[in-house]
Amino acid sequence: MRWLFWSSGSQQAPNNNKDNNNNNNNNNDDDDDNNNIIIINNNINRRPPLTLECPSPSHPPCASCSTKATTFPSNPKRGWNTSLTARDWAGEFKDPRNLIPTLLLTGGILFCVRIHRQYLRRIPLATNISPTYFHKRSLFGRVTSVGDGDNFRMYHTPGGRLAGWEWLPFRRVPRVKKELKDRTIHIRLAGIDAPELPHFGRPAQPYSHAAHTWLTNYLLNKRVRAFPYRQDQYGRVVATVYVRRFPWIFLRRDVGLQMLRAGMATVYEAKSGVEFGGEGKESKYRRAEEMAKRRGRGLWKGWKGAGWESPREYKNRMAGVEGERAAAAAAAAGVGGMGELGVNGGKN
């Protein structure tokens, strides 16, 4: 039995040796295939490939590994000081990583410039207002002084608090009169006419001081919004003005309409050049004036009595008086000239 086991084992040994020889042959064939190096020329860079003794780019090389992998050189990185050709410049500019940020930055700058010119540019004087503002745009600012019962001066603050006015250090409204010179817009309330204060040698009209005091208390140091219509012959801007007052800060009030209701002004009467901001506003103004008349408010107290005159009648009367004075002065100058001429003629 021992001989049979040995003999059977001796018979299987040649087969095992044959299998081992086959396996060794296969391994040798694999090694020969792996040792073959494939060289591919780069058509763009015209550089030969580099070979690394590494089985895979994802695995580090080892001492027992003799497999060679083929890699290809990449384009060298350019520095900031590297000179570029025209072709390189075109390629760099068309790169989306450069083109898209450039377009976004340029568009953003142009948009900011347009917004600043249209909405955030401060207007110092009434004469600097573009005609495109009339009947289309508005002016926002703080009232710095009240000159009469129907006009005041405003410091333009475009954008208001959202643009930094009143809380940023470099966006403060000046308080000193000297600093406000040639930096405020002279506004005349549209559609109303208040009693005249004494000026240009004319006496004060009744209720002129009351109207001036009322408007000063109502507007001075307040933020207002004016809708300009045109410029008058005195360089002022004729505009409808709105203001928000505590506690009704969410409701804006028409300043001219409030003066008519208080009896501190009349509806503006003139043959031409009257601005109301629309027919609907004119009818509203006339209804407010009629209500103040019936209730006898302000300058309408005793208006049916003798000697009462409206601001328009006062202006017409003073214009007539000044015309008579001018005619008398011209006549006196003419008589004096004739007398001197006669004296000189007698001497000759």
Curated annotation (Swiss-Prot):
Record key words, sorted: Calcium, Endonuclease, Hydrolase, Membrane, Metal-binding, Mitochondrion, Nuclease, Transmembrane, Transmembrane helix
Segments of skewed composition (Low complexity): 15-27
Keyword Membrane: yes
Pfam families the UniProt entry points to: SNase (PF00565)
Residue span, TNase-like domain: 137-302
Family assignment from sequence similarity: Belongs to the LCL3 family.
Binding site for Ca(2+): 193
GO cellular component: membrane; mitochondrion
Topology in the lipid bilayer: Single-pass membrane protein
SUPFAM superfamilies referenced in this protein's UniProt entry, alphabetically: Staphylococcal nuclease
Active site positions, chain numbering: 188, 196, 236
The protein's name: Probable endonuclease LCL3
GO MF entries: endonuclease activity; metal ion binding
EC number, as in UniProt: 3.1.-.-
Domain of life: Eukaryota
Catalytic class of the enzyme: hydrolase
Ranges where the record places region Disordered: 1-37
Residues that span the membrane, as ranges: 99-115
Protein's cellular compartments: Mitochondrion; Membrane
Lineage: Eukaryota, Fungi, Dikarya, Ascomycota, Pezizomycotina
Gene: LCL3
